[in-house]
Amino acid sequence: MASSSNPAFANPAFQEQRPGLTPPVAQTSFATSSHQAADLAAQAQLEGAFAAPSAGSVDTGRMTVEDTVIKTVSLFAILLVTAAVGWIWTMAGVTPATPQNVSILPWMIGALGGFVLAMVITFTSRKKVRPALIFAYAAFEGLFIGGISAFFEYMWPGIVVQATLATLSVVGVTLALFASGKVRASKKATKVFMIAMIGYLVFSLINVVMMMFGAFPAGSGGPFGMLSNYTIAGIPLGVIIGVLVVIMAAYSLVLDFDSIQQGVRNGAPRQYGWLGAFGIMVTVVWLYVEILRLIAILRGNN
């Protein structure tokens, strides 16, 4: 199994276990059935996650794919509710007389709160999974998504529907390919992914610093720094990088699905389904924001 880049899956519950060793997760001994049989069972669960009834995780006290799917859906329900709040809050001051009064406060509160909670969840989940913190994270992410979506929609009407459909398409195709066994994570691909991720983070940091120090004056070509001001063969740099980042996010989803499947094979306690749902949300939110920015760059000043 290739290790996931998502910090939510750094917990031993989602790591491949060496024969004869028991992972130290909540002082619980995991199932000891053969790896091959467990792998087949986990694969069958994933393929039938949306068609089969609940696998009875309440009775077994173990993590299942179906239960993780239910937890993921519940987190996104919370996100959608608070996203509506963030959207309304962002546009509350906009009137025909003051069309420029778009508030970025929900966006900033959501981003900061989500980041802090993500760090807390990641570093405390090795000892205990706290669903309440994950619920709060989903709520803050909703404020962030609602705020940034309202702002982008104000600038580029119709962009939110485009980004949402594109995100759902990427997630759906990735899940279908993984469930069918046609796409799997590998150690080599994961190494390339990690290198690309580090490179992208460094580039993003440099881009933000340049924007902060006025390297790209207003009206110089776009609001995204190097992403919208530089071109390669006539194509905005942001489009080229954006496509690559969407592919990276899709592969990150594959790693997330693989980690959840590994947790099921390990017989992880049921509460770790919340951690799996949290990890999926982190990746999907990242994917949506990247697609939103990519479409904005493509649409330019239209």
Model-derived segments and their meaning:
Residues 1-302:
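A hydrophobic alpha-helical transmembrane-helix feature that marks the membrane cores
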